[in-house]
A protein has these predicted regions:
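Conserved catalytic-core segment of nucleotide-activated headgroup transferases in glycan assembly
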Residues: 252-269
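Active-site and donor-binding regions of nucleotide-sugar-utilizing enzymes
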Residues: 2-255
């Protein structure tokens, strides 16, 4: 990949503050299939009446959705801790958490271990205020509208609108949650294994966020990928791949014992 192409790719990529809106396996497949890493240069296209009307409906429902989440948290027992240094977002694989404990000095009494994809799991540790929820929802709606008008193809716009209610309410709640963590300790570190919308919420709350890969990586779509503080991978080829496509995160290779006796080892796949 040429340096010139890489620079063009980065320059025309969706700004990091808006990428959370595009988190969707369907959108990612479309972007990668079309090799559409970058957006049209002209912003502020006019939305069709159908898209505008449906998006307005989604926005209205989003206010009811976050109010429901606000009330729901009071029916869940909170195990709040005075000081938090780490939050591990468990993606359900098991070995992703093991990687975190192996690499970093984690203190269990100052750590939240959260099921990354369950809002109820976040509610077990912190409660969020309705004012902050509402403020973040309004900001999220603005972000969503900006992306809708960026000039993506109609199939991507349709998916954006279809996923709007889920993405708006989920991201809004997560961002408000991570702001609570930041207020407790701005030096808290978030560890995750590619939980994308959760990562965006943490990063945009100004928290250091580390992505721990548990296996070989696939192709990365820069329009969706979060700007992690650091990334851990298994091979130098993966490290070079991230560096070549213009990812600005610090990329590290997992430490390993060098194999010098090639004729006395068995590798199991």
């Amino acid at each position: 990949m040429s340096k010139e192409y890489t620079n063009k790719q980065i320059d025309q990529c969706v700004p990091a503050a808006y990428r959370w809106t595009l988190v969707s396996s369907e959108i990612e497949k479309l972007l990668l299939k079309k090799n559409n890493y970058f957006i049209q240069e002209k912003y502020e296209i006019t939305l069709t009446k159908k898209v505008s009307a449906y998006f307005l409906f989604v926005c209205i429902l989003s206010f009811f959705s976050i109010f429901y989440l606000y009330l729901k948290q009071f029916f869940i027992i909170v195990n709040r801790r005075i000081k938090i240094e780490s939050v591990i977002l468990d993606t359900g694989r098991g070995y992703d958490c093991n990687n975190v404990y192996k690499l970093f000095k984690i203190k269990n009494d100052k750590t939240y271990l959260i099921n990354a994809f369950s809002i109820d799991s976040y509610m077990q540790y912190e409660r969020v205020g309705i004012f902050n929820l509402t403020k973040n929802l309004i900001n999220s709606i603005y972000d969503y509208k900006v992306v809708l008008k960026m000039g993506f193809s109609s199939d991507i716009v349709d998916i954006l609108v279809k996923n709007g209610l889920t993405n708006l309410s989920t991201y809004t709640y997560l961002k408000t949650f991570f702001e609570e963590i930041r207020n407790k300790n701005p030096n808290s570190i978030i560890y995750t294994s590619t939980a994308l919308i959760q990562s965006h919420a943490a990063i945009l709350s100004n928290l250091k966020t580390v992505n721990i890969y548990h296996g070989l990586i696939g192709k990365v779509c820069l329009n969706i990928y979060p700007e992690y503080y650091s990334i851990y991978v298994y091979s130098f080829d993966e490290k070079r791949y991230f560096e070549n496509i213009g990812v600005t995160s610090k990329v590290y290779v997992y430490p390993a014992i060098k194999n010098k006796l090639h004729n006395k080892n068995v590798i199991l796949f």
